[in-house]
Amino acid sequence: MVSTNPPVLPISTTATDTTNQPPIVTAVVESQPPVVRAFVNGVTETVCGGLSRSRPWSELLDRSAFTKPDSLSEAGTRFRKNSSYFRVNYVCIVALILGFSLLAHPFSLILLLCLAASWLFLYLFRPSDRPLILFGRSFSEYETLGGLILSTIAVIFFTSVGSVLISALMIGIATICVHGAFRAPDDLFLDEQDHAASGFLSFIGVPAIPSVAPSASSAASPV
């Protein structure tokens, strides 16, 4: 009897499924880093651009320029001029005081970092077309935003974070107020208009002081 080989049956594999899955997973994973990278690059460029417009610290701390104001109105005028001229330096001083205060209170720093990470990864960097899923439950955009707002209120007002932030801000504001009131601005504002229009965090700055050159020329012209 002649033996015949059994017919070869086609065997189906799931190779197509495995080959199609990695690109989908890769696309999902790689869709997040560019957003984070763009955010970090934007913040870095903003900070570096603002710091490049700061005034020399030797000019800020020039001891020969500190004099006692004659009146409260003069102190207010000095502060207004100095805050416009040293706006970037003042922001750096407040930021340094705030940073040292948080470093002195590690628990508050950890809570604040966790809160910031929650806002970044659960709301800002999360795709808007994908709902947030936690513990098997899907949360809508408004539910996520409401939860983050309530968490922020709870962390700031019911923990030590609020007191640390408020005390640091008060110390920083008091420091720049004292400096602005006692620093005589007679030698300042030589090129103020170039810097006031593009200052660091310009939304906290005061409007630029107009130049006195046009008024002086108009006063010198004959009637």
Curated annotation (Swiss-Prot):
<feature type="transmembrane region" description="Helical">
    <location>
        <begin position="146"/>
        <end position="166"/>
    </location>
</feature>
<protein>
    <recommendedName>
        <fullName>PRA1 family protein B5</fullName>
    </recommendedName>
</protein>
<feature type="transmembrane region" description="Helical">
    <location>
        <begin position="170"/>
        <end position="190"/>
    </location>
</feature>
<comment type="similarity">
    <text>Belongs to the PRA1 family.</text>
</comment>
<feature type="transmembrane region" description="Helical">
    <location>
        <begin position="196"/>
        <end position="216"/>
    </location>
</feature>
<dbReference type="Pfam" id="PF03208">
    <property type="entry name" value="PRA1"/>
</dbReference>
<keyword id="KW-1133">Transmembrane helix</keyword>
<feature type="transmembrane region" description="Helical">
    <location>
        <begin position="83"/>
        <end position="103"/>
    </location>
</feature>
<dbReference type="GO" id="GO:0016192">
    <property type="term" value="P:vesicle-mediated transport"/>
</dbReference>
<comment type="subunit">
    <text>Interacts with PRA1B1, PRA1B2, PRA1B3, PRA1B4, PRA1B6 and PRA1E.</text>
</comment>
<keyword id="KW-0967">Endosome</keyword>
<keyword id="KW-0813">Transport</keyword>
<dbReference type="GO" id="GO:0010008">
    <property type="term" value="C:endosome membrane"/>
</dbReference>
<keyword id="KW-0472">Membrane</keyword>
<keyword id="KW-0812">Transmembrane</keyword>
<dbReference type="InterPro" id="IPR004895">
    <property type="entry name" value="Prenylated_rab_accept_PRA1"/>
</dbReference>
<dbReference type="GO" id="GO:0005783">
    <property type="term" value="C:endoplasmic reticulum"/>
</dbReference>
<feature type="transmembrane region" description="Helical">
    <location>
        <begin position="105"/>
        <end position="125"/>
    </location>
</feature>
<comment type="function">
    <text>May be involved in both secretory and endocytic intracellular trafficking in the endosomal/prevacuolar compartments.</text>
</comment>
